[in-house]
Amino acid sequence: MNHDKSPIILIGFMGTGKSTIGKYVADEQNLSFIDIDSYIEEKYKLTIPEIFSKHGEQYFRNLEFTCLQECINTADIIATGGGIIESEEVFNFLKNQKNIIWLDCNIDIIYSRINDDPHRPNANNKTIKQLNDLYCSRILRYNEIAFKKFDSHLLSISEIYYELLNLIKASDQY
């Protein structure tokens, strides 16, 4: 990646396809890709649920921001965790980034994808109403910083890929 260029940063609620789409686009275009959650797990040798359990959510959010800052100048595409916008400091940092792409999805589909997933501490053992409340609490923040929004339940991976490819070409960065 040319370090004068801004990465594509995928934001959105858990289960909307950020990691899947980010990896797909990176593979198709021979770009570098980092999934922040995977990066954290590799770097700290703990799973996300273990970090939540041992240290709490705020500690995890601090790690998330540290890792985002480490990756911002080295990755072409970054998939963030769904709650990355919870911290005011991270939110303000992201507001200053150029290529923020919001992947959104219908809450019923999200619920079917992540219900009782032990790797998602903010989703495990939650009712659809509890998950929807969390989702609704984040929508305005996603919307405020997103350059572009894609509804991943209405578009296929390849359709989102071609839309992102058009954005990449239009920005003439890669």
UniProtKB/Swiss-Prot annotation:
Needed co-factor(s): Mg(2+)
Job of this protein: Catalyzes the specific phosphorylation of the 3-hydroxyl group of shikimic acid using ATP as a cosubstrate.
EC number(s) stated in the UniProt entry for this protein: 2.7.1.71
Pfam families: SKI
UniProt: Mg(2+) binding residues: S19
Gene: aroK
Organism domain of life: Bacteria
Locations listed in the record: Cytoplasm
One GO molecular-function entry: shikimate kinase activity
GO cellular component: cytosol
Keywords tagged on the record: Amino-acid biosynthesis, Aromatic amino acid biosynthesis, ATP-binding, Cytoplasm, Kinase, Magnesium, Metal-binding, Nucleotide-binding, Transferase
Binding site for substrate: D37, R61, G82, R138
Note on how the cofactor is bound: Binds 1 Mg(2+) ion per subunit.
Binding site for ATP: G15, T16, G17, K18, S19, T20, R120
Organism lineage string: Bacteria, Bacillati, Bacillota, Bacilli, Bacillales
Catalytic activity line of the entry: shikimate + ATP = 3-phosphoshikimate + ADP + H(+)
Family: Belongs to the shikimate kinase family.
Species name: Staphylococcus aureus (strain MRSA252)
Enzyme kind, highest EC tier: transferase
GO biological process terms on file: amino acid biosynthetic process; aromatic amino acid family biosynthetic process; chorismate biosynthetic process
Pathway connected to this protein: Metabolic intermediate biosynthesis; chorismate biosynthesis; chorismate from D-erythrose 4-phosphate and phosphoenolpyruvate: step 5/7
Subunit description: Monomer.
UniProt-recorded name of the protein: Shikimate kinase
